[in-house]
Structures are given as C-alpha cells and as structure tokens.
C-alpha cells in the first residue's frame, strides 16, 4: 500500500518518503494561484495504475498558462507513461481562478476549471469566460479517462468544446461525486453543493 503526496515545489513522493522522479515540473506555472491543482488515483488504480493531475501549464512564448490534465503511472519511484489528455485551447492571461478539481463516477472523469479572472484578451476583457460557450474556462468538463469526449455530452452551440458538461462556474475549488444523491428538494434540505 502506498500513498502519493505532492510538495509545494511539485516533487511527488510515495508513502516511504522516497522522491519520485520524472514529472515535468518545468512545465508548471506556479505564479499566483497557479501550480499543481489536484491529483487523483483512477477508481480502478489497483488494475490500471493511472494517476491523474491537473495544473497550470506554462506557455512557451509568455507567462500565460493553459490548464492541463495529465495522467501517468508509477514505476517504483519514477513517473512513467505521462501524457496530457486534456488542455484548454486558449490561454489565461491572469494567474488566478484556475479552479481545477478532478472527480470520477462509474463511467466518466469530471474536471472543473475556473473562469481565469478577466482573462483571454487581457485585464480589460469583461468577466464573461464562465458564460462564453466557445472556450473551456469556467466550466465542468466530462470526458472518458483517456481524454476522449462522450457523444452524450450536452451540445451548447456548434462552436462549443465537446467536453462541456456544465457552464457558469467562477472558480470551483471542490468537485465530488455522490452516487446516493438522487433527489434535490428544499423540503428535504438537500443541496447540489454538498
């Protein structure tokens, strides 16, 4: 039995406290609210060995970032088979509101992404990323565990990313799946945000 932890400087470690090598920390933009944002084991980790992480990813030409979701496996104390399976198509020009949590249900992977503050176009851009159906910012995305998109996802408009599942999120810092919550009503004091 092992557990994986991440230190502030993006060093992965296992329960025996050995350093894990191989994560491309030079690709992580850790300014502001950026950095390594979440890490989750696949629900079937015991059989497939996949670990998922999301992070603000540096851009080659500037200090702007995309939001990336990667998966990898561990080979003793080395990261193996790392691959980016999802990445925003546009850059955030601010270093905040990345959001970013990972959750699984029995079939899909869900990824929350913050609206990135007043990004895309700079600080004078209106705060509309969460409502903008043509980008990935400020949304919950539903994908398969290999990064492909289910055909059953909602279609918001013809230019919307196919991964969109829910829109209008400012900076989601939590995301969980509750298979037993099937009834939402004020009289039962239930809430989707539990």
What are the roles of these predicted feature ranges?
Residues 65-78, 125-146:
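Beta-propeller blade signature
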Residues 135-144, 163-192:
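Extracytoplasmic, non-cytosolic globular domains
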Residues 1-120, 174-194:
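Acidic, Gly/Ser/Thr-rich repeat motifs that build Ca2+-stabilized beta-propeller blades
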Residues 118-135, 151, 194:
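Acidic/polar, solvent-exposed loop segments in beta-strand-rich repeat domains
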Residues 24-29, 124-130, 161-162:
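Second-shell loop/turn segments in exported
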Residues 106-113, 137, 143-151:
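A structural motif
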């Amino acid at each position: 039995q092992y557990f994986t932890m991440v230190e502030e400087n993006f060093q992965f470690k296992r329960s025996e406290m050995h350093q894990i090598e191989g994560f491309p920390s030079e690709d992580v933009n850790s300014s502001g609210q950026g950095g390594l944002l979440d890490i989750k084991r696949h629900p079937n980790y015991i059989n497939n060995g996949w670990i998922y992480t999301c992070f603000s990813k540096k851009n080659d030409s500037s200090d702007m970032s995309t939001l990336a979701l990667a998966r990898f496996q561990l080979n003793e104390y080395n990261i193996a088979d790392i691959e980016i399976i999802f990445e925003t198509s546009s850059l955030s020009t601010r270093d905040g509101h990345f959001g970013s949590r990972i959750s699984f249900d029995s079939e899909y992977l869900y990824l929350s992404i913050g609206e990135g503050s007043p990004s895309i176009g700079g600080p004078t851009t209106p705060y509309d990323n969460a409502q903008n159906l043509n980008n990935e910012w400020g949304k919950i995305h539903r994908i398969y565990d290999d990064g492909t998109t289910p055909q059953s996802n909602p279609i918001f408009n013809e230019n919307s990313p196919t991964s969109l599942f829910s829109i209008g999120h400012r900076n989601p810092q939590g995301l969980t799946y509750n298979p037993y919550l099937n009834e939402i009503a004020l009289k039962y004091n239930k809430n989707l945000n539990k």
